[in-house]
Amino acid sequence: MDASHRRVMMASAVGSALEWYDFFIYGTAAALVFSELFFPKYDSNTGLLLSFATFGVGFFARPFGGMLFGHLGDRIGRKPVLVITLMLVGVGTFLIGLLPTYESVGVWAPIMLVTLRLVQGFGAGAEYGGAVILAVEHAPPGRRGLFGSFAAIGVNIGLLLATGVFALVSSLPKEDFLSWGWRVPFLLSIILIVVGFFIRSRVSETPVFSQIAAKNKAARSPVKDAFIKYPREFLVVLGARLAENGLGYLYPVFTLSYMTKQLGLQKSMVLNGIMLAYAISLFTVPMFSMLSDRIGRRPVYGGAAIFSALFAYPFFLMVGTGSQPIIWLALILAISIGNSGMFGPQAAYFAELFGPKLRYSGFASARELGSILAGGPAPFLATWLLGQGNNEPWLVAAYMVTLAVLTAIAIYFGPETYKTDILADKADAKR
């Protein structure tokens, strides 16, 4: 692995770290404090539902960002688009840390919060897809799973950083946490913005896009063409996202709220358990990715989805014991094994599903449409289901099983791609 490959993997990881740091601190703040700061006129359960609704709003902006920046990424190149998306996500998050609360400006506070959430979502719509494509299109044959996993590793780094920062500030006295402590994680995002901009400005354009540009073969309408030429692949991505993205937000966001507010567990204990699970995922994500380079994307992805379906009910039984070691083990099995087993091979798999001229548009658009169905509404729906079940988690567990089973079905009907030529135009091959 030479220096250029290392730069590519760092560039891939740092943007994903920023995106998911930003999104996780928002989700954590929504679970812990936003109901008091931005929706104080409502009872605690309604305020929490409204907080999670603002969390979901950003996901509705993601497909539009995916379509616009995916179009640009297939037209002008992967690198310039990745610099733009990095800045949009980072600046939106930093500004949330400067927002006045409802006590200061009334209804304008949640309006500004939702606006910045939309900015975050718009930029994030093409961030992860572009980071993956940057890595996969630079990868040597037979190592696309490993190279693509660096974007996924960046996700876990971002989640780990976010959890760690929130664990520190949540240990403050409640008055300090509500007055200024919650702002610190958002303001610290400026560090990742600066580092990410420096690294991405030094990385080269991918060899695949360079060949397309040299032959003047860039697609005129890549988003429309991707929908028309890859309908099966779009459906596979949508289905594959249900469990990976839905459970990926339920475990750290909804269950954080459930364990602290319904079970009365300490925030620091739960956050430390989540942080441990993501630390272990730094190793399990590339492990599952490398395994997918050897045996294929579908067996690894589908196997992890089945595991997640089987583990949904045991997860809540383990959490319900109130025992720290058992709760931490539940989080490790759910996040480091079940979710990482899907997330690891996903990067290369989604990139390989689409041909080079439409890859960015197809990947970003399909993936972020999946976000609307999965991660965006997941905490809100889980909170609503919890209320419908008299604060017992079994309806939530059934929802999780449903997501995982649908993902397993989508993977079963999807094509295997780990031996495909990354330069081949699959749409042309179909005709």
Positions of predicted regions on the chain:
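Extracytoplasmic gate region of multi-pass secondary transporters
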Residues: 27-28, 231-280, 375-379
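Extracellular/periplasmic helix-loop-helix junction of adjacent transmembrane segments
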Residues: 30-62
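C-terminal ends and interior cores of transmembrane alpha-helices
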Residues: 87-106, 306-322
